[in-house]
Structure formats: structure tokens, C-alpha cells
Design a protein with these regions (language model features):
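Periplasmic-binding protein-like
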Residues: 54-67, 87-89, 128-133, 183-194, ...
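Extracytoplasmic "Venus flytrap"
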Residues: 1-16, 38-45, 67-68, 132-142, ...
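General small-molecule cofactor/ligand-binding pocket signal
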Residues: 34-38, 159, 235
Length: 265
């Protein structure tokens, strides 16, 4: 649950599918795999508490998660202390220290910030950009700063940088009015889909901003929120699109996931 609930829900469904397929083939070394899911609610304290419970269970051999940067940052030191293999699927913040027991299967914010800036300059051909990010979240602030730094290196003018006190506020009109007045052709707003979709993008349009809106992988999920028409001229970077992958194993996974969950993976 929490700000990025859709990610956790999809991951659990994917894990459940994998476990069922592994066990149907006899398990691992003849032993059945058991999946135990715990909800960190997108909160650092909840994540630490849940992780410590798993550490205390001698039957737990590895942990997949937490998902997002804020919760993974809280768990990172615990992984090495407990020597429990932990894999974070989407913790992109550069501030997270991976060690001997914590790994991630995603790119870092410095990378996606650079890619987004390059796309803005080379594909969208804009000259002036603005950034809006949440100062209280390592993901939002990290990728926001990475984009701004990369944009300046590419010769783009960062005409305005605005911030919110957290990455899950619901009112951004004051900041967006300043961005609209700045002459920005593109707004880079690194928040999660659950904030960008219902709040930031429609509020940007309401104050008269009709330029491009761009975000990071946290925008993956926009189709779950808001009026899809408002996403015209909206772009985001993401790790991977299963739909575009022709590998037979990937397509088999998509088919099995849809069949089991009646939903897109």
C-alpha cells in the first residue's frame, strides 16, 4: 500500500506466479518454495520493522524488496548487518549504498536524469526547462537534481526550480504558476504516478502550462489514474517494457500473468 502501491501489488503477483511455476516443477533441490509477503506501506519505519521480522525468521533465505528508494534506504544497512540477501527491484536513488547483501535490478537516478535531459534536448528540441521535486524524498530530489545538472551540461536553460516539502502533497498550484511564468517549454516533475496523475499534471494544465511534462520511472502507472487525455505531451523514462520484448520466455510470462491475474503485468 502507500504512494507506490501498484508496484508492490504487481510484484507480489509476479512472485506468486514464479513460486507456483517453480513448485509445479518440484521446487528447488526438491524443496517447495514458500512466499511470505509483508506490506511496508511505502514508509521507512514500516519497512525496517517488516524487514527485522523477516530477519528473525530462520526459514527466510532471501528478501525481494523493498521496492522504492525511501524504504530501501532504511533497510540497506540492515541487509549487511543480518547477512540476508536482499534485492531491491526499483530503488533508483544514488544515495543508497549497495553492499555484499543488498542488490538492485534497476538503473540509478543519475542515469535516468541524464537520459531524460538528453531526450528533452535532442528529441523534443526544447531550450528552456523547469524542475519541480519533493525535497523530503531521496528519489524525487535525487532524480530532479540529476536532470537539472544534465540539462545544463547539454546547454538547456533551467529557468526555474521549484520544490514541495514532500513527494506526496496534493497541492502544487503555487509552484506551477511560477513555472508557467518562467517560460519553460518542459516541466520535469519526478514524483510517483499517484501524485503526478491526479495532482501535478492537471494542476499544471489548469494554470495554463501547455508544454511538455516529463518524469522518471515513477510515472509508470499513470494509466491507472486521471483522464488519459491530460497525458498528451507527457513522457517518462522507465527500465523496461515487456510488451516490446519478443523473447519467448518474456511473452510466456505475460501470457501466464494475464491468465492468472486478469491484468497487464
Amino acid at each position: 500500500s502507500g504512494t507506490a502501491a501498484a508496484y508492490g501489488e504487481a510484484e507480489v503477483k509476479g512472485f506468486e506466479l514464479a513460486v507456483s511455476e517453480i513448485n509445479a516443477k518440484g521446487g528447488i533441490n526438491g524443496k517447495k518454495v514458500k512466499l511470505e509477503s509483508m506490506d511496508d506501506k511505502g514508509d521507512a519505519t514500516e519497512a525496517s520493522n517488516a524487514y527485522n521480522k523477516l530477519v528473525g525468521d530462520n526459514n527466510v533465505l532471501a528478501v525481494a524488496g523493498p521496492t522504492i528508494s525511501a524504504t530501501t534506504a532504511a533497510v540497506a544497512p540492515l541487509a549487511d548487518q543480518s547477512k540476508l540477501v536482499t534485492i531491491a527491484p526499483a530503488a533508483t536513488s544514488d544515495s543508497i549504498e549497495t553492499g555484499n547483501y543488498l542488490f538492485r535490478t534497476c538503473f540509478k537516478d543519475s542515469y535516468q536524469g541524464e537520459v531524460a535531459a538528453r531526450f528533452a534536448a535532442e528529441n523534443l528540441k526544447v531550450k528552456k526547462v523547469a524542475v519541480l521535486y519533493g525535497t523530503g524524498d531521496p528519489y524525487s530530489s535525487g532524480v530532479g537534481e540529476a536532470f537539472a545538472k544534465a540539462a545544463e551540461k547539454l546547454g538547456l536553460e533551467v529557468v526555474d526550480k521549484e520544490s514541495s516539502s514532500s513527494a506526496d502533497d496534493t497541492e502544487y498550484s503555487a509552484q506551477l504558476q511560477k513555472i508557467q511564468a518562467s517560460g519553460a517549454e518542459l516541466l520535469y516533475a519526478p514524483y510517483y504516478y499517484s501524485v503526478a496523475g491526479p495532482y501535478i499534471i492537471p494542476q499544471a494544465r489548469s494554470v495554463g502550462f501547455d508544454g511538455y511534462v516529463m518524469g522518471p520511472d515513477g510515472y509508470d502507472g499513470l494509466k491507472l489514474t486521471g483522464d488519459k487525455a491530460q497525458y498528451n505531451k507527457t513522457y517518462y523514462t522507465t527500465h523496461y517494457s515487456a510488451d516490446d520484448n519478443t523473447n519467448s520466455k518474456v511473452q510466456d510470462f505475460i501470457k501466464s500473468y494475464k491468465s492468472k491475474n486478469n491484468a497487464e503485468p
